[in-house]
């Protein structure tokens, strides 16, 4: 491809609203153009990248035995009402009416549609297992679209749905999809981790997320560098350090702590480590008042807490309800002398000589100890986020925390949708059984942004070769002024194309600095620079975008060298 025949639309500066590096660079490189809030046009350069990702996904999904189909983007309300999600999915669902006032939605996901297909078409166990997938546009009305295509309202997704006669078959396909996803992200060239995850609103039992590792990631991931353990921080179990409580170091004292409400402020004021303070949170569930106890440096994990049956719908108590129940302001709450149910995190049981609220405004208690000043909590659960240095749940080392961008998610849905929508089959004995179901999603358009977050520098994007818009760029210096340069450039350009190398020739009548800046911005990983001085010796300069290497090659070496470093 010649730049003169291509649409290259780069910007020197990104719009002010672009927060993430990927958003800024995608706009500057002309990969996307904003149409409206959370709505983007994929320009020719960006679409080449998107198509390459889709091609890799299709190859691996087809290789796994999955069958591609394409379902409608617009769904009749009746299907969603049947599953019970029409009223509970929330405002993210874009609901519309046709000219006959019939209700529809623009599909945020396709479980209902695929289950409708399955119940119509799957009659016998002989048709199972089967796995359908599509690459389709979806719409979710995000309250605050941001970060470009990372959290857009309209996005492209690969979603697959498998149907099975029994749980064993589902688990086999689930493992197959886990392996398939790992191959997909490896081929794309991403550094990623598969992590155990919460099933969330989709529901079901087993669940894993696939995260591209990036400092800008919204999700926190706990992993063990000495093993394969990795989990979303919402799900990672906090294992006890096995610390024995110390003997009391002194009598309990009430200390004035004026205007010190947070654990960090109290710790600083009293010159004690924050882990020696006790955090007391007030919550209400089903009309009952509870105090949650955590170590001062630990954060409440709401996902874990909601898995405690009697706290499944808890909400934080506001100041007025706290005062009405305890007579004390938030910030000075503590577990001593209160007549309310107490729920403690496991780590709290290892505390001794700690600081807690005195249930009196402006005061805290110091040198507090269990079994002397208050009884040990009876109701103890894992309700905190893990932190770096916690023991790994698999017993093989210590946890570390990193950030990740979720690009894939797989679920064992079991019968969550098939039972509600009466999707059944006849087993070997002729008995009617409910279909077991799996669900497997990849954020196709999101992968582009995630890859950029992981592969960029101050000059622009550095795409992995597998998804780069072009494998090689040719920058001729003096192309329009030197006939010899022009002839050699054209010869090399034709040879690259004949060899199957995806090449972009910058044949514009521009200053070299402009051409270099554009090529570095748009993310082409390899570059050949042809100038008069080197050409006299039959040489050209190769420049690697990723490793910033530079070396001279003879004209005859260019094709074999580029083919080798591009993997073929």
UniProtKB/Swiss-Prot annotation:
GO biological process: prolyl-tRNA aminoacylation
Entries under HAMAP family matching the protein: Pro_tRNA_synth_type1
PANTHER family found in the cross-reference section: MITOCHONDRIAL RIBOSOME PROTEIN L39/PROLYL-TRNA LIGASE FAMILY MEMBER (PTHR42753), PROLINE--TRNA LIGASE (PTHR42753:SF2)
Subunit structure of this chain's protein: Homodimer.
Name of the gene: proS
Catalytic activity: tRNA(Pro) + L-proline + ATP = L-prolyl-tRNA(Pro) + AMP + diphosphate
Enzyme Commission number(s) of this protein: 6.1.1.15
UniProt free text on domains: Consists of three domains: the N-terminal catalytic domain, the editing domain and the C-terminal anticodon-binding domain.
Subcellular location field: Cytoplasm
Source organism per UniProt: Nitrosomonas eutropha (strain DSM 101675 / C91 / Nm57)
GO molecular function: aminoacyl-tRNA deacylase activity; ATP binding; proline-tRNA ligase activity
Pfam family name, one: tRNA_edit
Regions crossing the membrane: none
Gene Ontology terms: cellular component: cytosol
Protein name (record): Proline--tRNA ligase
Keywords per UniProt: Aminoacyl-tRNA synthetase, ATP-binding, Cytoplasm, Ligase, Nucleotide-binding, Protein biosynthesis
Similarity comment: family membership: Belongs to the class-II aminoacyl-tRNA synthetase family. ProS type 1 subfamily.
Annotated function: Catalyzes the attachment of proline to tRNA(Pro) in a two-step reaction: proline is first activated by ATP to form Pro-AMP and then transferred to the acceptor end of tRNA(Pro). As ProRS can inadvertently accommodate and process non-cognate amino acids such as alanine and cysteine, to avoid such errors it has two additional distinct editing activities against alanine. One activity is designated as 'pretransfer' editing and involves the tRNA(Pro)-independent hydrolysis of activated Ala-AMP.
Domain of life, source organism: Bacteria
């Amino acid at each position: 491809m010649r730049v003169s025949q291509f649409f290259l639309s780069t910007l020197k500066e990104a719009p002010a609203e672009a927060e993430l590096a990927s958003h800024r660079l995608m706009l500057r490189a002309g990969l996307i153009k904003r149409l409206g809030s959370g709505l983007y046009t994929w320009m020719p350069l960006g679409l080449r990248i998107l198509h390459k990702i889709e091609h890799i996904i299709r190859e691996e999904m087809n290789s796994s035995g999955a069958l591609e189909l394409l379902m409608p983007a617009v769904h009749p309300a009746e299907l969603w009402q049947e599953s019970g999600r029409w009223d509970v999915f929330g405002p993210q669902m874009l609901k519309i009416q046709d000219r006959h006032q019939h209700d529809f939605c623009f599909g945020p996901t396709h479980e209902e549609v695929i289950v409708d297909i399955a119940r119509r078409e799957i009659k016998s166990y002989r048709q199972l297992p089967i796995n359908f997938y599509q690459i389709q546009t979806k719409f979710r009305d995000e309250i605050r679209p941001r970060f470009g295509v990372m959290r857009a309202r309209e996005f492209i997704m690969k979603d697959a749905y498998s149907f099975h006669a029994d749980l064993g078959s589902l688990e086999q396909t689930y493992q197959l999809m886990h392996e398939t996803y790992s191959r997909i992200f490896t081929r794309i060239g991403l550094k990623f981790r598969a992590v155990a995850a919460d099933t969330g609103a989709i529901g079901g039992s087993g669940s894993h997320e696939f995260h591209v590792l990036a400092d800008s990631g919204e999700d926190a991931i706990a992993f063990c560098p000495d093993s394969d353990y990795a989990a979303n921080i919402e799900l990672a179990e906090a294992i006890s350090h096995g610390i024995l409580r110390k003997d009391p170091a002194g009598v309990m004292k009430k200390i004035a702590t004026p205007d010190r409400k947070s654990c960090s402020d109290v710790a600083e004021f009293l010159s004690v480590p924050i882990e020696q303070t006790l955090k007391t949170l007030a919550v209400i569930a089903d009309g009952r008042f509870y105090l949650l106890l955590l170590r001062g440096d630990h954060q409440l994990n709401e996902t874990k807490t909601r898995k405690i049956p009697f706290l499944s719908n808890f909400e934080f108590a506001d100041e007025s309800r706290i005062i009405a129940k305890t007579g004390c302001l938030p910030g000075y709450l503590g577990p001593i002398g209160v007549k309310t149910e107490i729920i403690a995190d496991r780590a709290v049981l290892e505390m001794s000589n700690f600081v807690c609220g005195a249930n009196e405004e402006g005061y805290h208690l110091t040198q507090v100890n269990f079994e002397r000043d208050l009884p040990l909590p009876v109701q103890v659960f894992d309700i905190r986020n893990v932190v770096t240095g916690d023991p790994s749940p698999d017993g093989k080392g210590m946890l570390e925390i990193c950030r990740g961008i979720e690009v894939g998610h797989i679920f064992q849905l079991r019968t969550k949708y098939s039972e509600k929508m009466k999707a059944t089959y006849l087993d070997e004995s002729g008995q009617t059984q409910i279909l077991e179901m799996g669900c497997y999603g990849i954020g196709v358009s999101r992968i582009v942004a995630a890859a950029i977050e992981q592969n960029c520098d101050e000059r622009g994007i550095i795409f992995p070769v597998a998804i780069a818009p072009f494998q090689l760029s040719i920058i001729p210096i003096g192309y329009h002024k030197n006939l010899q340069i022009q002839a050699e450039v054209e010869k090399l350009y034709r040879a690259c194309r004949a060899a199957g190398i995806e090449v972009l020739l910058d044949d514009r009548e521009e200053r070299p600095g402009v051409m270099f800046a554009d090529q570095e911005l748009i993310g082409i990983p390899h570059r050949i620079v042809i100038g008069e001085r080197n050409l006299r010796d039959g040489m050209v300069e190769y420049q690697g975008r990723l490793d910033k290497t530079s070396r001279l090659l003879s004209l005859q070496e260019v094709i074999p060298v580029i083919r080798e470093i591009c993997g073929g």
